């Protein structure tokens, strides 16, 4: 039942992007659901992470704020799998990640499931790079207005909706991705979300990213308990 709900949610998201007719988008759905159906091996995920990911994302998956590299520790399992599938099918643009998922060791749904479980089991990020605090109150207001209904009040994300946790994430990475959303450079997102970001002013994006980078707390992913 849970997997069926995920499938329905995912298909609805792809329909709202207008890209469901594309072969890439269809394939992302198929690959994501395949990976979620597999029994994940966190130990294999740890080995894969050490071999394939640690160079950019760091030994504890804390990312690198100064280089716009996101923290992955404690991130939602379903979301990680979906993004790896999207990179694999070039439904999300990131040249370095296209190279990573083209490697044999990281090219299959089983590897994505293993990596996602390992990452979700890690302690949450700490010491995220933040902004200057100038627009924090504006950022909090923007979050409550535009983001909390999907990402939850505390930005923990949602297991069933492929909605990522945003808290403890690096400020510069968040700003970059929000600008990508506003510019239409993220193909695998809901059109309403992209439209919301197109309507945000620069100081609202700055404040929103700064506010999220300072939010603390663990993420408890129900999918990891199955």
Report each predicted region and the residues it spans:
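N-terminal export/targeting leaders of redox proteins
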Residues: 1-39, 85, 214-226
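Gly/Gly-Pro-rich "capping" loops immediately C-terminal to redox-active cysteine motifs
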Residues: 35, 46, 58, 62-92, ...
């Amino acid at each position: 039942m849970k997997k069926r709900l995920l499938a329905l949610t995912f298909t609805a998201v792809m329909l709202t992007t207008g890209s469901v007719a594309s072969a890439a988008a269809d394939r992302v759905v198929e690959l994501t659901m395949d990976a979620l159906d597999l029994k994940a091996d966190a130990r294999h995920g740890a080995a894969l992470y050490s071999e394939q990911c640690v160079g950019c994302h760091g030994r504890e998956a804390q990312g690198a704020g100064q280089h716009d590299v996101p923290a992955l520790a404690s991130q939602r399992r379903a979301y990680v799998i979906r993004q790896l599938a999207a990179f694999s099918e070039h439904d999300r643009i990131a040249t370095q990640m296209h190279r990573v998922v083209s490697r044999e060791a990281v090219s299959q749904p089983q590897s994505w499931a293993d990596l996602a479980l390992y990452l979700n089991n890690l302690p949450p990020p700490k010491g995220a790079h933040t902004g200057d605090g100038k627009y924090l109150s504006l950022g909090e207001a923007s979050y409550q207005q535009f983001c909390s209904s999907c990402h939850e009040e505390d930005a923990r994300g949602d297991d069933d909706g492929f909605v990522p946790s945003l808290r403890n994430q690096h400020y510069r990475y968040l700003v970059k991705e929000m600008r990508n959303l506003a510019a239409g450079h993220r193909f695998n997102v809901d059109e309403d979300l992209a439209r919301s970001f197109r309507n945000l002013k620069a100081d609202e994006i700055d404040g929103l990213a700064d506010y999220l980078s300072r939010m603390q707390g663990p993420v408890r992913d129900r999918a990891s308990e199955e």
